[in-house]
Regions:
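Terminal connector regions
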Residues: 26-28, 110-138
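Short acidic/proline- and small/hydrophobic-mixed sequence motifs that coincide with surface turns
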Residues: 68-71, 86
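Short aromatic-acidic-glycine turn motif
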Residues: 78-88
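Bacterial N-terminal signal peptides
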Residues: 8-18
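Short, acidic/polar linear motifs in exposed loop/turn regions
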Residues: 63-68, 82
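Intrinsically disordered, low-complexity Pro/Gly/Ser/Thr-rich segments with frequent PxxP/GP/PP motifs
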Residues: 86-116
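Bacterial N-terminal signal peptides that target proteins for export
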Residues: 1-9
Length: 138
């Protein structure tokens, strides 16, 4: 009799626990297709600082497109006074989709070179090009 009672109690406790976790789960997320072709991206003026023998550039970026941007990639290129390429940064890659209105911080590191005069940034994503817009504030 006690064995039957213990089995019944254990079974009912197990059902209560599993029933509570099933109802407490978050609703399924809806997948949104990423932007194809040209996407719009806003950014603040880049801030460059020298750290040892590296120049570290930080850029705040905001997705202004209607959909998420998949595979965001940012490159930085440095040129000398004659316009010849001197060096460049390792590309920054954002592995997740950049959702509409989301703000992230891009950090680019470049080794210093005495010939460096000016730089240029290239923004692109896995499904096309990016049209950038300098924002006064975020």
């Amino acid at each position: 009799m006690t064995r039957y009672l213990c089995t019944a109690l254990a079974l009912s406790a197990g059902l209560l626990l599993t029933g509570g976790t099933a109802s407490g789960q978050a609703p399924a997320t809806k997948l949104i297709s990423p932007v194809r072709g040209e996407a719009e991206l806003g950014y603040l003026k880049p801030v460059s600082k020298r750290e040892g023998n590296m120049i570290v550039t930080t850029i705040k970026v905001k997705n202004l497109a209607a959909g998420p941007i998949a595979g965001l990639k940012v490159d930085e290129f440095w040129y000398d006074k004659a316009g010849e390429p001197v060096t460049g940064a390792q590309p920054f890659r954002y592995r997740k989709a950049l959702m509409p209105g989301e703000v992230i911080e891009v950090v680019l590191r470049v080794p210093t070179n005495p010939k460096m005069d000016r730089n240029q940034y290239k923004f692109e994503h896995s499904n096309g090009a990016i049209k950038t817009k300098l924002l006064p504030k975020m």
